[in-house]
């Protein structure tokens, strides 16, 4: 599979690649994800990461 300019998956022309129907990417609002405090701890492979909303309204992920 490869991306086109419209960022949709398209099958490769190579016969060695299987064509799979792409599943939609899940979408969630940052407000729902971060909650009223604007912070979320993510556990990834035993490591903790903090995702938070900055005062400027941007998202910041730190270890």
Swiss-Prot record:
It comes from the Bacteria. GO terms for molecular function: protein homodimerization activity. Residues 1-17 have a biased composition (Basic and acidic residues). Residues 1-32 are annotated as: Disordered. Residues 18-32 have a biased composition (Polar residues). It holds the Pfam family hemP. NCBIfam families: PRK10183.1. To Y.enterocolitica HemP. This is Uncharacterized protein YdiE. It comes from Escherichia coli (strain K12).
